[in-house]
Each structure stands twice: as C-alpha cells, then as structure tokens.
Amino acid sequence: MPFLWLCWALWALSLVSLREALTGEQILGSLLQQLQLDQPPVLDKADVEGMVIPSHVRTQYVALLQHSHASRSRGKRFSQNLREVAGRFLVSETSTHLLVFGMEQRLPPNSELVQAVLRLFQEPVPRTALRRQKRLSPHSARARVTIEWLRFRDDGSNRTALIDSRLVSIHESGWKAFDVTEAVNFWQQLSRPRQPLLLQVSVQREHLGPGTWSSHKLVRFAAQGTPDGKGQGEPQLELHTLDLKDYGAQGNCDPEAPVTEGTRCCRQEMYLDLQGMKWAENWILEPPGFLTYECVGSCLQLPESLTSRWPFLGPRQCVASEMTSLPMIVSVKEGGRTRPQVVSLPNMRVQTCSCASDGALIPRRLQP
C-alpha cells in the first residue's frame, strides 16, 4: 500500500502542466522522491517540541533561499523576422571546415529564436571525377556531413556539441540546409562579451570499409562567392525570430483586474499555506507557507503565413519558461531521535511565464 501511495503521488506530479498552480500534492510528491520515502512520516508534536534548528542548518536554508531567487532553470522556450548572416571559413582542411559568424546585434532585442538554419552551397563535382569515382567505388556515392558547435573555454580548452548530421549525395549540388537552432541557443547562454558563433563542418565517409575512402573527398562546399562576384555561394545563417512585443507575455498580472479569456499571458500570484495541510503537520518546519505563481491568460496565435512556414509548431500557450527551486527544512526521525534537515525541491516555483508553441525546441542547458 505505501508503494502504491508513492506511485500515485509521483504520477500526479508528472501530470501537472507548467501553467497550473502549484499544489500541496506536488510538494508532497517531490519531497517523497527527494527523501526516498514511500509515504509521509507521522510525527507526534512531542517529537518536534523543543527542537532547536542549529545555526549551520539555518545558514544552509537561507543560502538556498537566496540562490533560488538568483538561479533559474529554463523550460520550453519559443521564439516574423528573417535575418541572414554571412559566414567565413576560418580553417579549411581536406574534410573539416570551421565557420565563423559574428552574432552580436544580429538577434533583435525583445525577441526569441524560432529557428536557425545554416545554408551551405555544395559545389558540383566534375563529370570526369564522377566517372573515376564510379569505377573505383561503385557502391559509395554519399558522404556524411556533420555540424558541431565549437566553444573555446577560458582555460584554453574547447568543447563541441553535435548539432546536425545527414547524408548527402555526390551527384547533387546546390544549397543544403542544416538546422542549427540549438547551436544559437548555446551561444545565447554564453556570458558577455560573447565569442563569435563557431560551427565546425565535417565531411566523412558514409561507412567504413574498403572502396569507400574517396567519395567524401568529392563533397565540397563553397567558401567564397560564385565566379560572378555576387557572393551567392557564401555560407549563410538564417535567423527566424518572433517579436515578443506582439507574441510574448506581459509579465506579472494586474492584481486589480480579473483574469478572463482575453487576458494576455501573465504570472498570477498565489499563496500556498503548508500549515493547513495534514501531511505537513510536525514534518515541515520551514517555511509555513510561501508565495507561488501560475501562468494564466492566452497568447496571440501565429498567422497562417507563419504556421505554413513552420509546420512543426503547434498552438501557442501560456507556460512557465523559467522555474526555481523551493528550499525547506523538514523533520527527520532516525534511531528514536528527530533532527532538522534541509532539502531543496527543484522546479517548484514559477519565475517567468512566456508564450510558447507545442513542438518548439527545448534548449539543453550549457554545461561548464
């Protein structure tokens, strides 16, 4: 029975939408998971009477409180503008290129990124080279193109993150599009002043084995403009963004105005009283209650001209885009003695409400 009780609590926690108000059941489910308990402990008043919270426990609790107000975790982010950034090849080797894009002031203020597309121009392969390749490697006519985001760290080392990878035919030529939205999301998380956006383009064999070594060498991307001097072959980075002045949320709700269907997406303040919950009695020492928030209201939907361009995006909804943790002091009974313990429940309080679409990319957090 206790196991079934825990399963129910965690199931209820998983069903909660990011736009709904935080409930006592969610707090309980997270606490049970954090403390690895099957059910809430039953503590008598005598167990906690006269208990003094040590200064180091109080200090830890206050530090977590301060950190929760400064540290935020991002949830789903969603960003009619199209901007192209010309890139240049910094390094060109047999099968690896490093593209450099100057990004400062390229993203409009008060906007969010919907999609970033890298366009590379694949040069046609001379017919003589194709005939020779077919004679030497008849079963290999494709190569794998991989896009990675490259980051140089302060200590001089570098890290890469896989962004996109696909097979291209040596018999094709023209513009090839790669989705590099995640790379731009990573770049946005860098501290200022930000380094340029670095994208590493690698051309490799489709698979290992004899007779496949030469095909990938025939795949080449234009590094400069076409012979007519118009620069049409240069690598291009397209940035698709939405103006949040029209499509974003408004911040905190007006406490004097009732929330209706026409209310623009906002963060509504609420108070969760833990003292009034039976399961928290004699177990939750701090806080007795706290301010919590929910995301309410509606969002302006995209016009048909944009939904047809981005068919992967669903209806826009008012959701929590940034969450923060909730520190607590609880009573823990061990060996007949009761002591206070600090726990921190992640993603419990809404910090920011935003308008987002189903299907929008959820960015990965940038690792140190």
Curated annotation (Swiss-Prot):
GO terms for biological process: anterior/posterior axis specification; cell migration involved in gastrulation; cell population proliferation; determination of left/right symmetry; heart morphogenesis; negative regulation of cell population proliferation; negative regulation of nodal receptor complex assembly; negative regulation of nodal signaling pathway. It is found in: Secreted. GO terms for cellular component: extracellular region; extracellular space. Disulfide bonds join C253-C266, C265-C318, C295-C353, C299-C355. SMART domains: TGFB (SM00204). It holds the Pfam family TGFb_propeptide. GO terms for molecular function: cytokine activity; growth factor activity; nodal binding; transforming growth factor beta receptor binding. The processing of the protein may also occur at the second R-X-X-R site located at AA 132-135. Processing appears to be regulated in a cell-type specific manner. Keywords: Cytokine, Developmental protein, Disulfide bond, Glycoprotein, Growth factor, Secreted, Signal. Glycans are attached at N158. Residues 22-76 form a propeptide. Residues 1-21 form the signal peptide. InterPro entries: Cystine-knot_cytokine (IPR029034), LRDF (IPR003942), TGF-b_C (IPR001839), TGF-b_propeptide (IPR001111), TGF-beta-rel (IPR015615), TGFb_CS (IPR017948). Belongs to the TGF-beta family. Required for left-right axis determination as a regulator of LEFTY2 and NODAL. This is Left-right determination factor 1. It comes from Mus musculus.
